[in-house]
Each structure stands twice: as structure tokens, then as C-alpha cells.
Amino acid sequence: MNPVVAVAFVGVSLRYTKVLENVGAATLAVETAREPVAEVDEILSATVLPEPDIPVGLPAPGEVSFEGVSFGYDQARPVLHDVSFTVPAGGLTAIVGPSGAGKSTLFRLIARFWDADSGTVRVGGVDVRDQTTEQLMSQLAMVFQDVYLYDSTLTENIRIGCPDATDEHVRQAGALAGVDEIADRLPGGWDASVGEGGRRLSGGERQRVSVARALLKRAPILLFDEATSALDPENEAHVEAAVTQLRQTSTIVVIAHKLDTIRSADQIVVVDRTGRVCQVGTHDDLIASSGRYADLWHARERAVGWSLVGRP
């Protein structure tokens, strides 16, 4: 090749290399964004659930009931089958069962994130479909296993539970959930920023903040979705102490894998792998009946003290 042509070819190649790199990067960015954009589009195009214009009277405050409820996220895969049980007002009801049985789905139907395919979900004695969103949400406080905190202060993240609360009330609720210990550790105390998503706090500490929100809201019904399953003993103790406080004033419904934490529940609802309620009763009653709950309990007892043993 003629040296002049070779130099010209190299010069042109170098000129367009950056352009081609930018095109490749842009293509990758478009492909990466395709799935999130599709998810946002799905959310925006979701059908809005109908609701009444005005609140209705609640004949049974603090009570939750399922009456012949069946539900599936799609028609081909039903999750719940003909579920019926009542959560009495003012007590602690625990829901137990294997993973994938539909326990968290029960909570989502209580909060009306979806409507049941058949049957009726009642909160406060009234079908959730006959309540305004504001009325329904005012009765519920929810504590989930995965907690998201905003890039704001400890105080403001707790105040979300009750926007009109004073700083004093926020700190009282925080103290009951053990958040005061977190405030003492952080530079800035109660005014310290927790970072986006609460990244400056551990998972257990974020859970305490979430419980403090629920304490501050003082809702008639509290839903705990496996809130202590991944906590260390110290954080778990703080959360359980806060639940004891809430138990004095609220109806508590808790999903639990740790059966020893719900022995004192007023009622235990057992859900099997098919999404059906197979047992309802107290711990002692269910142990005596030798059913699914007893199997789970005895499996837990066999696992106590289990440890990995290294090779000699």
C-alpha cells in the first residue's frame, strides 16, 4: 500500500473510532433502559381500581376478614384458593406457611394493591372495594422486610408515618423502636441524613425506623411482613419490644418464619403450599392437633443446635 494512502487510512480510522465507540455505548444504554421503560409504561397503563367518592361507616374497627377469597397474579397461576378466616380486633394473628404459599399476597389484598378474583376482603367490617383509598390506608400501617428510606433525616423518615407529628412525638416513637440509639451514634443525631435508600444504616436499623413510623401513625391495624426474619438478635429484640407496645392499642397481623416468635399469638393461621388455609388456632391447639403446624414446629425443634461440623 502506498505510504501516503496508509497514513490517510489510519487518520480516517482514528477519526471515526470515537464515533463508533459512542454509537456502541448509546446502543447499550438504549438496551439497558428498555426493560425499566417497559415497566414504567406498564405501571402508567395499569387500570385504576374503582372506589367510592365518600368514606363509609366502619361497623367493626380493627377487624380484618377473608371470605372465600381466590386470587392469582395471572389466570394461569392462581396463588390463593377459597381463603376464609377472620382477624379479631385488638389481637395478634400470625400467618405461617412455606415460601410461595401466598402469605404476602394476603397483605397486598388487605391493602388493596390488587382486587381478589373472587370472594371478599373486609377491613373494619367493610369490603375494601367500598372504601376510599384514603379511608383504607388510614386504618393500616405496614412494616415490610425490605424497607426503603428517603435521603433525608432520621426525624423526617419517621414523620412520614404522621406528617403533622411534632418533633417530640417523633422522638418518642423512635425511642420505643430503639431509633434513639441510632441517633446517638450518628453525627447530627436526629437531624443526620440516612442517605438514599437508608444506605448509611444497616438493614436492622432501617427496620427500626420503619417500626417507629408505624408507632407514630397509631393505625388500628398493623401488618408485619416477615419484618424480623433477617435481623440480628439486638435489632430483633428492639422490634419485638415495639410490637409489644403496639399490641396494646392495635390489631397486629404478622407473617413469620421464626415460629418461636409467635407462640403467644392469639391466633395462628396456617397456609399450605397450594394457597389454602389448612389450620387456624392457638399454638397449643395446633401442636395438639398434629397437623401441618405441628410438623413445622417439630422440624424447627430438630434444627435447634444444628451446626456445620468441619472435617477432622
Task: Please provide the spans of the model-predicted regions.
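ABC ATPase nucleotide-binding domain
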Residues: 83, 133, 137-140, 151-152, ...
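The feature captures the beta-strand-to-loop junction immediately N-terminal to the Walker
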Residues: 96-98
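ABC-family ATPase nucleotide-binding domain "signature/switch" substructure
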Residues: 105, 138-146, 157, 173-179, ...
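Conserved post-Walker A/P-loop segment of ABC ATPase nucleotide-binding domains
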Residues: 114-122, 164-165, 264-265, 280
